[in-house]
Amino acid sequence: MRWYQAAITAALTLTFLSPGTASAQGRPCAGAKYSDSHFHLTNYIQEGTDVKDYVRMMGSTVCRSTLFGIPLQQAWDYRNTGDFAPWYYLQSDAPLYYYSFTDAFIAMAYKSLPAEQQARLDPMITGFNPTDMYAADHIRRVLTTFPGVFSGIGEFSIHKEFVSSKVAGGAASLTDPALDRILDFAGEAGMVVILHNDINVPFPKPGQDPYILAQLKAVLERHPNTTVIWAHVGLGRIVRPVTEQLVLLDRALSNPALSHVYIDISWDETAKYITASPEAVAATAALINKYPDRFLFGSDVVAPTSLDAPMAVYNDYQPLWNALTPEASQKVRLGNYQRLFDAARVKVRAWEKANVGKARPAPQPTPSSGAGVAP
């Protein structure tokens, strides 16, 4: 571990002495409303917002932001939609397929910015297939090809309403050892992971067991050294909260075996559940006030043309902001982002310093399979 400790020290020095880092960029964050832990620069046909325009939009309202595309491309199948070119997954029955070029696109967009603007962004790797045992190799390859760029992986999906059934190839699974390899490597490199995994299936029958919860708990407990942000509290357009969801979340957040797991409250579709009633707001606020270090805010806006859309999501949560303690509100909107992503920057830069240009080590066994994959 000597190399790792030395690299951490070097990375810390670079991080805190560079004029472009978060610690030295007080002006953009002075008076900011939030940092965005969940932002898509591009859409399902890989088009979107120019990164320079996005930084301009952020202005003094958004302190920092993640930066990632969509790992899936919506196919334009002429036999299905004719001359209509779908740009969203609900507009066509044609499949979605994994689109790895998104990572190079995000990296080059980030690298086109001056250092002081780069310091406000945390690019994420998404262009991998989580059913592929080589997915972890893709993530490693992106890191070594674009050192100094990425802070984490995600958002990527395992179970997602409407989307999972459209993806070409095998269905992603929480029990797949390919996912274990991904999470293993993210932990090794110090990357933050943003994972979309619905808490339940759409339209469950009365009394139906939410089997996804047990699988999710098991895979998260297998990777205690990997920082995971669970997106949207597991909710969706039609995936509703399960019975006693807040009780289950309380139990999870108090579990030492899950101390590495965080939750983002992002997306306007999530807001509709949290703000559905004064009682829902109060119960959610009580949970966040109890665990203020474990929640982050994100807009989950896709390729906006202005800050109106992200701010609309932020305002959707206003009843929640009003119900939180000032300390909890600050942490959810700003502080927890800085803490998690600053730590990731240091760890990932240290991993890159120790590994870029070096021979790739033999793959390690995954916790679930017990066998590695030959290099």
Region locations from a protein language model:
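Hydrophobic faces of well-ordered beta-strands that scaffold small-molecule active sites
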Residues: 35-39, 64-68, 119-125, 152-154, ...
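Active-site gating/metal-coordination segments in enzymes
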Residues: 26-28, 32, 81-201, 267
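An N-terminally biased module of ancient metal coordination in phosphate/nucleic-acid-related enzymes
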Residues: 24-108
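C-terminal segment of classical bacterial N-terminal signal peptides
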Residues: 14-23
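Mid-to-C-terminal alpha-helical segments outside catalytic/metal-binding sites
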Residues: 23-35, 46, 50-65, 289-296, ...
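Acidic-and-aromatic substrate-binding clefts and catalytic sites of carbohydrate-active enzymes
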Residues: 41-50, 72-76, 96-102, 128-136, ...
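Bacterial N-terminal signal peptides that target proteins for export
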Residues: 1-8
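Catalytic pocket-lining loop regions of alpha/beta-barrel enzymes
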Residues: 160, 167-297
